[in-house]
Amino acid sequence: MSVPAALTTVDDRVAGVLHDGGGEPSGHSPRPFLHPVSTPGGRSVSDYRPEDHPWHWGLGIAVSTIDVVGQAHPANLWGGPTYRDGAGYVKLPNNGSQEVRVEEGRDDGRVQQLDWRTADGTVFLAETRSWHAESVRAGGVEWLATTVRSRWANTSGGPLAFGSPTTSGRPDAGYGGFFLRLAPSFAGACIVAASTGPAPSDVPAPPGGAGTRLSEADAMGSTRSWLGLRSPDASVLMVPAADNPGGSSPWFVRSTGTPMLCAAPFFHRKLHLGVGGVLHWTWSLLTADGPVQDDAFAAAADAV
């Protein structure tokens, strides 16, 4: 387990603190995470080990359901129990890990070399992950942007399939991907998303027309180029790259009860990766102080 390291911009703002996850319980699927994730003013927008889901830690990459040849159960690199159709959530001996083999600091951020392992220690995927932070001014707002670039290489000797509880039979539970467990202050936050058409009739239209305010039900599982949440204290915006595998990302988002935001590429269907195959991903998370207006969300999404 390495010492946590601050992820900073060139102008010395701290976007968050990077942990390798090495000291976390095995049943929580140890993996790297950024926490606290900070706004330019130093307010934390992330949560760590909340009572309802103690395997939720800040910002990171987490996948709940991975089919690996030779394993009795799908590998769980999300943490906690696994959803099985007809049985619900079941505690299985399948909690794997993302083990950081090498981590180094660079002028533009930090780079990690990781092994994805099943519960029995078998390595099935090699990942190179970079973390980069920068200050962004967009829409008249100061933002802190954290960008993660990730290369996944299948080293298992067989095909892999990445899924979610929804691909396993549970509706509206397609979580897994680039995940942020939000701070409790985001309970009841307003959801703002890229416009893809008319807003639902029961949701007020945004003043600038640059985005759409969505109910949680309408946002859940929808496919949009970006999605954000606005609370009285802070705002967050998540932007997946347009050329990520599978195209525009579906979203898993909650602002009631358990606030969280996840670009969830495996929400509706499994993503398959053949023997020796490689996937490239890029995601950005932007934070700002206070309740950002809709047009500023859109401007920030265009800036990364």
PLM feature segments, named:
Residues 26-78, 194-197, 204, 210-221, ...:
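Extracellular/lumen-exposed scaffold segments
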Residues 158-246:
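Active-site/ligand-binding surface loops and adjacent short beta/alpha elements
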Residues 107-111, 143-147, 276-282:
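Intrinsic-disorder/low-complexity, polar/charged segments enriched in Ser/Thr/Lys/Arg/Asp/Glu/Gln
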Residues 236-304:
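Beta-strand-rich recognition/accessory modules
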Residues 60-142:
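Extended, loop-rich substrate-binding clefts of extracytoplasmic carbohydrate-active enzymes
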Residues 1-66, 159, 163, 286-292, ...:
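Beta-strand-rich N-terminal accessory domains
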Residues 18-37, 139-192:
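Acidic (Asp/Glu-rich), glycine- and aromatic
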Residues 113-115, 130, 149-153, 179-181, ...:
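Residue-level recognition of well-ordered beta-strand positions that form the cores
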